[in-house]
């Protein structure tokens, strides 16, 4: 089964919901993966996307930072997500399609300007996250 998939580091899904609607209308991918949603799941404006035919969503989120979501025209189910590096940062979600295909959506922050684990905690966290992938 062929399908189209788009991915977008949205940097706040609520702030850019109108742009998401434009993308869904003009490009109409079957599946859209969003990173850095910066929103608790219950605050994602799913109803706006559902009105455009994207009736399925799986997501992980938290207020103010990180967060990932998968919007789909096709039926998907929540197949979990890993807590890489034990950070509890809502950076990974898995959607499973009816045919068993799994879509993994990750948000991996840049890790800061100093590429040194000792001098930059965030860089060390990024290395730990990537190692566990």
Where are these regions (language model features)?
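Surface-exposed cleft-lining segments at the edges of enzyme active sites
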Residues: 109-130
């Amino acid at each position: 089964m062929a399908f189209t998939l788009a991915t977008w580091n949205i940097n706040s899904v609520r702030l850019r919901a109108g742009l998401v609607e434009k993308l869904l209308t003009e490009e109409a991918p079957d599946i859209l993966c969003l990173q850095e949603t910066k929103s608790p799941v219950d605050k994602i404006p799913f109803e706006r996307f559902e009105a455009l035919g994207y009736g399925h969503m799986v997501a992980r989120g938290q207020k103010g930072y990180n967060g990932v979501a998968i919007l789909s025209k096709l039926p998907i189910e929540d197949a979990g997500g890993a807590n890489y590096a034990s950070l509890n940062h809502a950076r990974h979600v898995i959607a499973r399609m009816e045919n068993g295909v799994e879509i993994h959506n990750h948000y991996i922050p840049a890790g800061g300007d100093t590429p040194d684990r000792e001098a930059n905690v965030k860089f060390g966290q990024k290395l730990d996250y990537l190692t566990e992938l």
